[in-house]
Structure formats: structure tokens, C-alpha cells
């Protein structure tokens, strides 16, 4: 079931040593597959340094994908790591249960050895840092302030609780500015008529 390929020993004993020495040789394992959830874990409160962290034991997919990933990467040097992961995930699903069985057995053996070596180990997934501010659809105060600035320049669609107040404020402002606008619009006409009459008197 396990053989030497390209000068590398893939026996169960060597694989176990590689899995437990992951911190010393991280290139031996590939754990970036989205479905594997094989992330760095700790046996304590999650605040230990990188050297004290205990890795999860490899699952069947990781046991299988180590050699396959190296093979695909050599055959397709231009392929991105994410694309390799997608391809490996698809190929793994295409395997029959009989083909997967040896890797499940090896993963079970690795879990037993991991349990003996770290009896107090508990899986603690890392939590993503919460965003300080959640993205919400148009806050009322922000919307009102934007409308207050832009209401005289751009047409605006009113939303939320500030719509009525802003509309009434705009109407009152327009009603106050309308006479001024009318007067200002008449001034150029009166000025032109006065200039025309003055020019006519000079000619006559």
C-alpha cells in the first residue's frame, strides 16, 4: 500500500513522523483545501506560540492529497495552488470507497497515535476577528446628512425615517428661494431693456 517514490519513503512510520513534525517541515503537508478544515490548533487556551501549537491529525483526504498535489504541481507548474486544490477535491470525490479505504485506515492510525501523544488535545477552531463596524444598508443619520448636502444639486430618492423631514425642509427652502430666484431672473431682462433704450436714444 505504501511505497518509495522518487527516493522518498511513504511508509506509515515515516508518514506519522512527518505529520507529527509538521512544525519543523511544513512543506511535507498541504492543508489548504477548503473542505478539510485542517488548521493550526492548540492544546491550551489558544495563546501559545507557533512552536507550542499542536496540529490536527491528518484526515484521509490529506493523506491522499499529499502525493497527488506534488504530482499535479510537477505536471502543471503554471497552475495556481487554489486550482490544484479544486482539482484534488474533485478527483477525491471521484474515487470509489474501496480506493479511499486505505487512506481512511491510515488516517485512523494517525489519529490514534496523535491521541496517545497529546491526550489532553481538544480541537479549537480559530475564530475570525469580528469587524468593528458591520456593513448595514444606509444608516438614517448618514443618509440625512448626505441629503442635506446634495439636495440642491442632485435628484434624490428618499429612504428611511428621514424622508419626510428632508422633503419638508426642501419644500420650505424652495418656497423661500423662489421669490429671490424670480427677482434675480428678472434683473438681466430689466438691465437689457434699459441698455437698449439708452442706446436707442443715443442713435436718435
UniProtKB/Swiss-Prot annotation:
UniProt key word Membrane: no
Q: Where in the cell is it found?
A: Nucleus speckle; Cytoplasm; Nucleus
Q: Which GO terms describe its biological process?
A: cell differentiation; male sex determination; sex differentiation
Q: Which Gene Ontology terms of cellular component type are present? A: cytoplasm; nuclear speck; nucleus
**Modifications the protein undergoes after translation, according to the UniProt entry:** Acetylation of Lys-130 contributes to its nuclear localization and enhances its interaction with KPNB1. Deacetylated by HDAC3.
The protein's predominant localisation is nucleus
User: Ranges of Polar residues compositional bias?
Assistant: 175-187, 194-204
Give the function comment from the record.
Transcriptional regulator that controls a genetic switch in male development. It is necessary and sufficient for initiating male sex determination by directing the development of supporting cell precursors (pre-Sertoli cells) as Sertoli rather than granulosa cells. Involved in different aspects of gene regulation including promoter activation or repression. Binds to the DNA consensus sequence 5'-[AT]AACAA[AT]-3'. SRY HMG box recognizes DNA by partial intercalation in the minor groove and promotes DNA bending. Also involved in pre-mRNA splicing.
Family per record? Belongs to the SRY family.
How does it associate, per the subunit comment?
A: Interacts with CALM, EP300, HDAC3, KPNB1, ZNF208 isoform KRAB-O, PARP1, SLC9A3R2 and WT1. The interaction with EP300 modulates its DNA-binding activity. The interaction with KPNB1 is sensitive to dissociation by Ran in the GTP-bound form. Interaction with PARP1 impaired its DNA-binding activity.
In Swiss-Prot or TrEMBL terms, this protein is called Sex-determining region Y protein
Taxonomic lineage is: Eukaryota, Metazoa, Chordata, Craniata, Vertebrata
Q: Which gene encodes it?
A: SRY
